[in-house]
Amino acid sequence: MAVRKLWKTVVQLFSKSKSEECNTEAGTMEVSFLKYGVRGLNADCSYVKSQCIKLSECECLYTFASDVCKEDFHNSEEMKVFVVQHSQEMVDGTDLFVHAEESV
């Protein structure tokens, strides 16, 4: 599903902009998330949140993932727009929209 690919891209880009500790935590979250799979835009947010809680030591990723999960997305385009708008400041020098487009 496009959302799963987009999420994977977001986690990868986000982890690159943070510390090595965050990079490791992002990888852990990505593996867990992709292993579980995504059945819908909002259906699995509770699972994502549970993963975020496990990664609470890595506050930057936890905050970002929590913010994504707070939104009520109706389609992948809405999610993409939200992610782009809220990630640009965090991922310096990276055109997230281009990467997101390539992943979808």
UniProtKB/Swiss-Prot annotation:
Source organism: Human herpesvirus 6A (strain Uganda-1102) (HHV-6 variant A)
UniProt name for this protein: Protein U9
